[in-house]
Structure formats: C-alpha cells, structure tokens
Curated annotation (Swiss-Prot):
E.C. code: 2.1.1.45
UniProt keyword list: Cytoplasm, Methyltransferase, Nucleotide biosynthesis, Transferase
Family of this protein: Belongs to the thymidylate synthase family. Bacterial-type ThyA subfamily.
GO cellular component term, pick one: cytosol
Residues binding (6R)-5,10-methylene-5,6,7,8-tetrahydrofolate: H51, D169, A263
Full protein name: Thymidylate synthase
Main location: cytoplasm
Function: Catalyzes the reductive methylation of 2'-deoxyuridine-5'-monophosphate (dUMP) to 2'-deoxythymidine-5'-monophosphate (dTMP) while utilizing 5,10-methylenetetrahydrofolate (mTHF) as the methyl donor and reductant in the reaction, yielding dihydrofolate (DHF) as a by-product. This enzymatic reaction provides an intracellular de novo source of dTMP, an essential precursor for DNA biosynthesis.
Gene this chain is encoded by: thyA
Assembly: Homodimer.
InterPro entries named among the record's database cross-references: Thymidate_synth/dCMP_Mease (IPR045097), Thymidate_synth/dCMP_Mease_dom (IPR023451), Thymidate_synth/dCMP_Mease_sf (IPR036926), Thymidylate_synthase (IPR000398)
C-alpha cells in the first residue's frame, strides 16, 4: 500500500490550505493517481484497521440499487447515517444511478448490467463506463457522488478498473474506496471468468481535513504489513447474487484503528 502512503505524504508536504463545504478546513492537492496490481494481494490498508463489514455491505447495497440506510443499519453499518433523512432515505445516490439511471422517456438504464453484458459482447470496447454523476439529480442527493465515474479495461484476460474520484477524503474515505472498487473489480472478474488486473485510482481534490493531520502522521509512522488475500465463493455466478458470506478476506493483520471525526 505504498501508493496510498505516498498520497498522505504528498498532501502533508505539498498540500495547500483550503476552505471546504463542511467548514473544517483541509490541506489539498489536485490530481493524483495510484495503481494497485490485484494479483499482488487485496489492497487493504494495514497501517490501521479498516471495518471490513462496512466495506463489503456498502458495496452490496450499491449493487442492489438501494438508497435507504435500513439494510446497512440492520447489518451494523452506520457510515451513511449522518446524511440520511428521518426515514433513512438518501435520495438518488450511488445505487440509484448505477442500477436505475432515469431516462427522459420515463424508463431507466441499469448501468452495471449493461457493462457486464457489453464486456461479454465486446471486451475491447472503450465505452465500459459507469457514472454516478447525474447533474439532473444532484439537488435531490443527500451527498453528491465523490467517487463518480469508473471504467473497465480487458487485456490478456485480466479485468482492470479505473475510478475517477472528484473529492477524496484521504484519511477516512480513500482506504474504503480503494478496497470497495478492488472488491467490485474482483467480483466482476469472477463472474466474467477473467482474472483481476489493476485498480487505478485517479483523484481530483485529494485532501486531509485539518483534524486528520495528526492521525495521518501517526499512521505513516507505522510499518506496513503483508497484504491479505481475497477469496470469493466459487459457486456464485451472477454479480447480483453475492452475499456477505461469499466474500472472505484472509490474513488481514493490521495495526489498531486510528479514530478521526467525520466531516459532514
């Protein structure tokens, strides 16, 4: 995970102080890219413990097209609670855009199903793109998409994914995002009978909140540990049939968690 630690160092060394929507203040850099070869291990940060249940359940929730926190809460995941309304709704956020992008004629587009089918039909396509950034729906979203567009690429029977993230909370959010999209790539490769390739993470505004700087320095003082391995249930043949118990992370031995406040 050296690429992630290099991001933290770059922000600490070169970041510019900026104001932000939350009023917390950040150190920020613009334009940064990381690359993770998924054959080398599952890219989970080891210099602090991540909450695996949240990562896995959130991705399954996205893939189900769900935009209410009830499923997450029933599985002990609270990462979206701060943005939900009194009914648990978040508006047309990620799951809605991924699975049911509204069309002008009243219909909808299932972008995930489409990209799976298109990979099977035309693996060399340069249109293997899924977008969560729908300007017509932004005002109705509890939180505008931070990780807003991703593209797949197939070469030598390896499936790679590149994510563009417009806004990247480097301490709390980015480790989750890396793991989530690495997991999505591996799950898609599994059902497509491909091997996982690279996960490429391209960041726009990459920032450390002012109240995360000390925690980032603490994390960088720790030694990295070997990456864990991902094991998926071989009996699952549809992306939409995965359940929590079908995803197993083996050999995850991180340093203790480092607490930091969420900027809302």
């Amino acid at each position: 995970m050296r690429a992630y630690h290099d991001l933290l160092r770059r922000i600490l060394d070169d970041g510019v102080a900026k104001h932000d929507r939350t009023g917390t203040g950040t150190l920020s850099v613009f334009g940064h890219q990381m690359r993770f070869d998924l054959a080398e291990g599952f890219p989970l940060v080891t210099t602090k413990r991540l909450h695996l249940k949240s990562i896995i359940h959130e991705l399954l929730w996205f893939l189900a097209g769900d935009t209410n926190v009830a499923y997450l809460q029933s599985n002990g995941v609270t990462i979206w609670d701060e943005w939900a309304d009194e009914h648990g709704d978040l508006g047309p956020v990620y799951g809605r855009q991924w699975r049911s992008w509204a069309k002008p004629d009243g219909g909808s587009v299932d972008q995930i199903a489409w990209v799976l089918d298109e990979i099977r039909r035309n693996p060399d396509s340069r249109r293997l793109v899924v977008s969560a950034w729908n300007p017509a729906d932004l005002d109705r979203m509890a939180l505008a998409p931070c990780h807003c567009l991703f593209q797949f690429y197939i070469a030598e029977r390896r499936l790679s994914c590149q994510l563009y993230q417009r806004s990247a909370d480097a301490f709390l959010g980015v480790p989750f995002n890396i793991a989530s999209y690495a997991l999505l790539t591996a799950m898609m490769a599994h059902v497509l009978d491909l091997e996982p390739g690279d996960f490429v993470h391209t960041l726009g505004d990459a920032h450390l909140y002012s109240n995360h700087v000390a925690q980032a320095r603490q994390q960088l003082a720790r030694d990295e540990r070997p990456l864990p391995r991902l094991r998926l249930n071989p009996e699952v043949r549809s992306l939409f049939d995965f359940r929590y118990d079908d995803v197993v992370i083996e050999g995850y031995d991180p340093h203790p968690a480092i607490r930091a406040p969420v900027a809302v």
